[in-house]
Structures are given as structure tokens and as C-alpha cells.
Curated annotation (Swiss-Prot):
It comes from Chlorobium chlorochromatii (strain CaD3). Its cofactor is Mg(2+). InterPro entries: Aa-tRNA-synt_II (IPR004364), aa-tRNA-synth_II (IPR006195), aa-tRNA-synth_II/BPL/LPL (IPR045864), Lys-tRNA-ligase_II (IPR002313), Lys-tRNA-ligase_II_N (IPR044136), Lys-tRNA-synth_II_C (IPR018149), NA-bd_OB-fold (IPR012340), NA-bd_OB_tRNA (IPR004365). This is Lysine--tRNA ligase. GO terms for molecular function: ATP binding; lysine-tRNA ligase activity; magnesium ion binding; tRNA binding. Residues 1-20 are annotated as: Disordered. Its main location: cytoplasm. It is found in: Cytoplasm. Mg(2+) 2 binds at E429.
């Protein structure tokens, strides 16, 4: 059995360890000693010719390939006239063999002042050690950065018959606050973020192959809209006006559809002044796509293709493990109306019910409701509490009540219902889509109804955006819209259980 602890449990061993401040002071003194010796501990550049992964994959025993690598010292064994150390670069780690007779006395003496965490440049040639490890025989060594703060390196010891890991950088809160250290010492964290970039690239290429245009829309907006959420506010001094950080980019993208583009998309940073938990960060990333002359049924098929294609390109597999469940993203996905889903999981029929009847249903289910919310929010609360967590395999939830979706087109055959779907995976929403409402008269009525909900105290109800209404009064073609939460999709495809594990620098409480 192996235990993991950030501090030694043996008090004698702990007392023999130099304090963090002592280690920093020693490194600062070493820095000054290097400077006094005529060595610049922070030179401008180094000519790198190879990365560790390339060397390890392309190594040939007899070649003695000349190489120049740079990286951070992660392990070090200082001996008499020859030493070994490992450097870590962006691609991995490789061992360096350093011999005094080869690099010279000055360079070897400098090496004796180096610590784990220092960044060095090495030139030499490749070889295989007697133990079979591919390594670099150093011919020159240059200090590139003197590290003044020691990085946490896991150390294993046997205590009372058990293997114990000391000094592991495993505290979640500390890892989020010091992501730069997390990336150094935890290779799997680096891989998650490399995969995040690959996911975004795969999606961008997917949209580009369809011929749709990538665009940019304002982050600072005079009126916020496109979602039910509370905004962050700021003030523009020169114009003396209040502005909002966008909660969604939907209304600006629709303006571009009015302007004549058949398909536009944007990878956007959005901001919502709401709570923080495993699935929510106030600043998050989503991609929104709008395609003219399409509807939500067409968009469901596209989403299946998008997620399957992205998973295969990035993971080379159509299955992933998420929140303890093995999930298949191979199409087709299940499709279920929100009314049928609630009926299936609660035995309650919500169709054609008044607000009072919906409140009674919620009460029967043991759900306490805010008295300020209306029918749509009540249904949303019931669905979120009793249905959504149970939808593990990819499921399209369709046909929402109009009040829940003021920007969506009414269903062609069902009054009071709109053509909308959400994709739920692992019990969480991953994307949202509409057949977009393009009747300006009905759109105005919907937004004015939202304004009345705001007067009742619903802070997330939408506001009336006169410029958006003016835009669609010029005529917006039939259109399907889609919003995909990038952070949650990355969680799904990398198997992470917290949004903080897929955002480099998540928001945290003050230290």
C-alpha cells in the first residue's frame, strides 16, 4: 500500500529538513556566487536542436547524434568527476551524463552549484548507458535560469512497512493556485491541457471544412443577452456608460446572419456572475455556431457528428470514462422530449399545467421553489433535480416550454413548445441548440415577457435589446444555433471530474 502526503509524518526527518525560507536564501546566495564568478544565471537564448521525445524515438545505437537540448533539472546525482541528471523539456525527460574531463573544470564547478529546478542547456551526443538508458553525453553545459524557489519533488520512503510519498504536490487547492508548479511536476496535467488544445483545433477544423466563417464579437456589451444569467458590470469612463461582460455571444452572431453570412462560429470567453462549483467557473469558454436555412433536427445530427469526430481525432476512440461511467459517443444519441423525460423519471405529467399546478408537482416531489420564478424555471428546476443527473449516456432533451427559451422558434405542431434541445452527458449539459426565432413581432413579445419576470425579481430573465430587434426586423433567414461548453466537453473527453482541472487558472477564493 502506498500513502500520499504533502509533509513527512516522521518528526525527526521533518526537523532535519531545511525550511523553505532557508532553501530560498541558499539559492539566492548561489545566484550571487555565480554572478561573482562571471556567470550570467539568466542569459538571453540557447540554440535548441532537439527535444527529448524526438531523441528517445529516433535514437540509433551507433550514431552518436549531436544534439542540443534545454530543460529543467528534475533529478540530480552529483559525484566526483562524473555526474548524472535528468532534464525535462516540453516533450518529456532525458538523462544527461556529465564528465568533468569533457566539459571542463569551470563548467563542472558551476554544475556543483546547480539545484533541482534550474534550467540548463546541454550540447553533446546521444548514447546508451550500460543499464540501457538512452542518454546524452554532455560536451558543454550552460545555465539558462537559476531557480530561487525549490519545486516539490515526490520522494518515496518506507515507513512501518508501507511506502509513503513525501512532498508530493497533491493538494488540489495549491495545485490550482500554482498551476505553473502543477505543470512542472505532474505530467498528466500537461497532457490534459495539450488535449484541450487538440479538442478545440479538431472542432475548429470541423466547422471550417463545412465552409463556415470564424468571427469575433464584442466582449464588452451595452446590453447583455443570449442567455439566462447574471452579468458582471463595468464602467467606461470616456463614454460615461455602464457596460457588461458578455454572458453569451448569440445576439451578435445572429446580427451577422442578418448581414448575409450563411454560417458563422466563434470560440468565446463568456462571463456569468454566478456560483463556483465542479461544473461552473465565472469565466468559461464556449463555441457558438449559427447556420442559415437549417433547424434543430439538422443540428442534432451535426452535433452527433461533431462530438464523434472530435473524440476519434483526439482520443482515437468513441468511448470515454467520465464521472465513473464508461460513455459511448458513437451516434445515434437517444432523443427524448423534456416532458417525456420528467414523466419517465418522476411519474409526473407537466404538459399543459398552470403555474400553480407545477408548483404543486414540485412540492409533491419535495422541491422548494423561489416564489419569484415562473413556469419555465419551475420545469427547469424539476428537470435539473430529478432527471438530468440520471442521463448518463448522450441524450438529446428536446421541445422545451416557450418561457424557458425566449429566443427559440415555436414548434411547428405543438403550441407552447419551442424547437430546442440540450445534449446531456454524464448527467450534465454539454450543449444547447434552437431553431432560432426570426419573427421580430413574436421576439419582441417574448423579450417583453422576460422584462416582466425581471420585475418579479428574476435576476436571470433577459432584457429587451432594441438593436437586436431592429436587426431581425430587416429579416433574418431561418437559422439553427448551437452553443457547446468547451470546458465540459474537455472534461468529458479527458475524464476529468472538475472544471478546475481543465482550466489553466480557475477562479478561487482569496488566499
Amino acid at each position: 500500500m502506498q500513502k500520499n502526503t504533502s509533509q513527512p509524518t516522521n518528526t525527526n526527518e521533518q526537523s532535519n529538513q531545511p525550511s523553505l525560507n532557508d532553501q530560498i536564501v541558499r539559492r539566492i546566495e548561489e545566484r550571487q556566487h555565480l554572478i561573482d564568478s562571471g556567470i550570467n544565471p539568466y542569459p538571453c537564448s540557447f540554440n535548441v536542436t532537439h527535444h527529448s521525445a524526438t531523441i528517445l524515438t529516433e535514437f540509433q545505437d551507433e550514431a552518436k547524434t549531436p544534439v542540443a537540448v534545454a530543460g529543467r533539472i528534475m533529478t540530480i546525482r552529483k559525484m566526483g568527476k562524473a555526474s548524472f541528471f535528468n532534464v525535462q523539456d516540453s516533450a518529456g525527460r532525458i538523462q544527461i551524463y556529465l564528465k568533468k574531463d569533457d566539459v571542463g573544470e569551470a563548467a563542472y564547478n558551476m554544475f556543483k552549484l546547480l539545484d533541482i529546478g534550474d534550467i540548463v542547456g546541454v550540447t553533446g551526443y546521444t548514447f546508451r548507458t550500460k543499464t540501457g538508458e538512452i542518454s546524452i553525453h554532455a560536451e558543454s553545459l550552460e545555465l539558462l535560469t537559476k531557480s530561487l524557489r525549490p519545486i516539490p519533488i515526490a520522494k518515496e520512503k518506507e515507513v512501518d512497512g508501507e511506502k509513503v510519498v513525501f512532498d508530493a504536490f497533491s493538494d488540489k487547492e495549491l495545485r490550482y493556485r500554482q498551476r505553473y508548479v502543477d505543470l512542472i511536476v505532474n505530467p498528466e496535467v500537461r497532457e490534459t491541457f495539450i488535449k484541450r488544445t487538440a479538442i478545440v483545433a479538431a472542432m475548429r477544423n470541423f466547422f471550417a471544412r463545412h465552409g463556415w466563417l470564424e468571427v469575433e464579437t464584442p466582449i464588452l456589451q451595452p446590453i447583455y443577452g443570449g442567455a439566462a444569467a447574471r452579468p458582471f458590470t463595468t464602467h467606461h469612463n470616456a463614454l460615461d456608460m455602464q457596460l457588461y461582460l458578455r454572458i453569451a455571444n448569440e445576439l451578435y452572431l445572429k446580427r451577422l446572419i442578418v448581414g448575409g453570412f450563411d454560417g458563422v462560429f466563434e470560440f468565446a470567453k463568456d462571463f456569468r456572475n454566478e456560483g463556483i462549483d465542479r461544473f461552473h467557473n465565472p469565466e468559461f469558454t464556449q463555441v457558438e455556431l449559427y447556420v442559415a436555412y437549417k433547424d434543430y433536427n439538422w443540428m442534432m445530427n451535426l452535433v452527433e457528428e461533431l462530438i464523434y469526430t472530435t473524440a476519434m481525432e483526439v482520443n482515437k476512440s468513441d468511448t470515454t470514462t467520465f464521472l465513473g461511467h464508461e460513455i459511448s459517443v458513437k451516434p445515434p444519441f437517444r432523443r427524448l422530449t423534456i416532458s417525456d423525460a420528467i414523466a419517465e423519471y418522476t411519474d409526473k405529467d407537466i404538459r399543459n399545467k398552470s403555474e400553480e399546478e407545477l408548483r404543486n408537482i414540485a412540492k409533491e416531489l419535495g422541491l422548494e421553489l423561489d416564489p419569484k420564478i415562473g413556469n419555465g424555471k419551475i420545469i427547469d428546476e424539476i428537470f435539473g433535480e430529478f432527471v438530468e443527473p440520471k442521463l448518463i449516456q448522450p441524450t438529446f432533451i428536446t421541445d422545451y416550454p416557450t418561457e424557458m427559451s425566449p429566443l427559440a422558434k415555436e414548434h411547428a405542431a405543438q403550441p407552447g413548445i419551442v424547437e430546442r434541445f440540450e445534449l446531456i452527458v454524464g448527467g450534465k449539459e454539454v450543449c444547447n441548440s434552437f431553431s432560432e426565432l426570426n419573427d421580430p413581432v413574436i421576439q419582441r413579445e417574448r423579450l417583453e415577457s422576460q422584462a416582466k419576470l425581471r420585475l418579479r425579481g428574476d435576476e436571470e430573465a433577459m432584457v429587451v435589446d432594441e438593436d437586436f430587434l431592429r436587426a431581425i426586423e430587416y429579416g433574418m433567414p431561418p437559422c439553427a444555433g448551437l452553443g457547446v461548453g468547451i470546458d465540459r466537453l474537455v472534461m468529458l473527453l479527458t475524464g476529468q471530474e472538475s472544471i478546475r482541472d481543465v482550466i489553466f487558472f480557475p477562479h478561487l477564493k482569496p488566499e
